[in-house]
Structure formats: C-alpha cells, structure tokens
Regions:
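Generic beta-sheet signal
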Residues: 38-41, 100, 119, 175, ...
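Alpha-helix C-terminal capping/helix-to-coil transition sites in glycosyltransferase folds
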Residues: 10-12, 93, 139, 205-206
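C-terminal amphipathic helix plus adjacent low-complexity
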Residues: 261-307
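Conserved nucleotide-sugar donor-interacting segment of glycosyltransferase catalytic cores
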Residues: 1-63, 104
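A short, active-site helix/loop in glycosyltransferases that binds the activated sugar's phosphate group
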Residues: 67-114
Length: 307
C-alpha cells in the first residue's frame, strides 16, 4: 500500500487487476477504483470456503497473532483500509473476475454469477530450446510422464513407472525435473526417454496419455492437444482438478498412496482402451474454443470502466 500511495501521487489509475491471493482488494479499496480479479485457478466453491478457519462463519475462528494484529491496526491507521475478514488475503474478490478456464470445466459453476467471466486458458505456442528427438515419437503409442517442476523425492515413483512400462509397445517420455536425484532412478529400457526437462507442448502433440500430478497449466496444455490423463494429485488445487477431470470422464485418478505397478498399468490401459476418455477431453477442448479469450476480457473491462 505504501508503494501504491507513492505511485498515485503522479498517476491517475482507472482500475486495478489483482490475483486471488494477497492485498489486491485492499489496493482497490484504497484507490476507490474498480477492481478486476484475475484467477488462473478454479474459483473456490462457497461451501468449501465455509470449512476454512479464516471464514467469518467458521465454528473455530482463526485469530491473528500479536504482530499481525499490530500490522492490521497500522494499515487501517495509515491507509484507511482493512480486510473485511481473515479470509480476504486468501480469497480476493473483484467487481468482475476473469477466470482462465471454461465455465464447463469450473466445478459448481452454477454458484458463480455472470460477473465471473470464463475467458479460457492462454496456451503458449512458443518453441522451446530444449533438444528432443521428436522423430522417435512419430507413429508410436506415447506415454508422457511429468509431475511438474516443484515436487521432489519422486525417485520411487519414477522407478515404479520404469517397472510398469518396461514392456510397453511404444515410447515412454519421462520428465523428472531437477529436484530428483537421477542416480536414484534405475536404468530404463530402450523404450524410455528420460530427461530433466522436455518440450512439453511438442510431446503432448504426439502423446496418447499423460501421467501427471494435475497442475492447472499442464492440464490446460494437455486438453489443448486432446490428451487424456492418468492423474495423481499431490497438493494445492490438484485434488479439485483431478476430481473435476474424473467427473467429466477425461481422466482416471489414482491416489498417490495407491500407486504401484498393477494400479498404474491398469489405469493407463483403461485410458488407452476406453473411448470415453478421448470423448471427455474433446468436450473440454471444445469448451475452451468457445471461450472469448483476451478479446472478451478487454471488452468486459471497457464495459466496467464505462459504467
């Protein structure tokens, strides 16, 4: 807020765009201008918010510690604004919300009114500088395995993948990131390509199934290329994403505690052999195509400013 105070001495702001987390809504209140929420994740259903200790209706209320209390008092004293409740820093609201997915994909979408604009994801078309023998994937069945770039300690999981798909009649591409110890991952047969990083979009353009933790960016990428999932959620919003993909018959979900050679093999076989997963993915892709994208976002912001 101090930075905002300094900037507004020389700049007349028309509106503010902010993330679902943090102090964005307080900046809107301080400047007394329209606010646009930018949400790259699902909107959180009201019934889930009510289970959080930060929610004003929670049975057991979260209480700020002494230091936090002093900072909140200082904020109100110096800037004349304060959070409406303890939940606000985790769940900002705006006059309108731009959501980077489709209303069809959003869980409990009926709970969110017309001021929530589902403009669809932004899929990067840029080429990466990562070298990869894409020609080896042509005209082959391809399993792509990636658990993102942040998870560590996944060496046992990757070893299970090697045991499971050592006889797979096709190519297995496994991206292990740089937080896992390559020396703890066993030697794989020739049908495996293992690397810290791979050009994900190019791999997905050839893949038949994607084994993933279910991060939203990777999920959107795979839907764009019509690749169904075996999804193994770990944390954050991944369980919600996995549940929704399963409901829409675009993924087979495995709990990470239940992953072994048998369950992983059965899951991949199910996704590769059952047409419902390809149909489910195509419906999701169609819902993205029908979204208004950046043009709709610009139009609704202009409409907000003209009110």
């Amino acid at each position: 807020l101090e930075i905002t105070k300094q900037l507004c001495e020389s700049i007349n702001f028309d509106f503010v765009i902010y993330d679902i987390f943090g102090a964005g809504e307080l900046v809107k209140e301080y400047l007394q201008i329209p606010g646009v929420l930018s949400s790259p994740i699902f909107l959180i259903p009201p019934e889930f918010l009510e289970t959080l200790p930060f929610h004003p209706n929670a049975e057991i209320q979260f209480q700020p510690d002494e230091t936090s209390g002093k900072l909140l008092y200082q904020m109100e004293h110096e800037f004349g604004v304060k959070p409406k409740n303890n939940l606000q820093f985790m769940h900002n609201k705006g006059d309108i919300s731009l959501v980077y997915t489709s209303r069809y994909f959003q869980p409990n979408s009926d709970a969110f009114g017309e001021n929530n604009i589902f403009i669809g994801p932004s899929i990067s078309k840029r080429k990466t500088n990562v070298e990869f023998p894409l020609e080896l994937l042509k005209n082959k069945k391809v399993i792509y395995i990636s658990m993102g770039t942040l998870l560590e300690g996944l060496e046992p999981f990757f070893n299970t993948c090697i045991d499971t798909f050592s006889d797979f009649d096709g190519i297995v591409v496994m991206a292990i990131g740089d937080r896992n110890d390559r020396s703890k991952i066993k030697k794989a047969p020739d049908n495996f390509i293992i690397a810290s990083y791979v050009p994900q979009s190019e791999i997905l353009s050839e893949a038949d199934v994607f084994i993933t933790h279910g991060g939203m960016n990777s999920v959107h990428d795979a839907i764009y290329f019509n690749v169904p999932f075996v999804i193994i959620p770990h944390d954050k919003d991944q369980p919600m994403i996995a549940q929704r993909l399963t409901e829409l018959e675009a993924a087979h979900q495995l709990l990470k505690e239940h992953v072994n050679v048998q369950t992983l093999n059965e899951a991949v076989t199910e996704v590769l052999s059952n047409e419902k997963y390809k149909h489910g993915i195509r419906k999701l892709n169609d819902s993205f195509i029908e979204c208004g994208g950046t043009k709709e976002a610009i139009a609704v912001i202009k409409s907000l400013l003209n009110k």
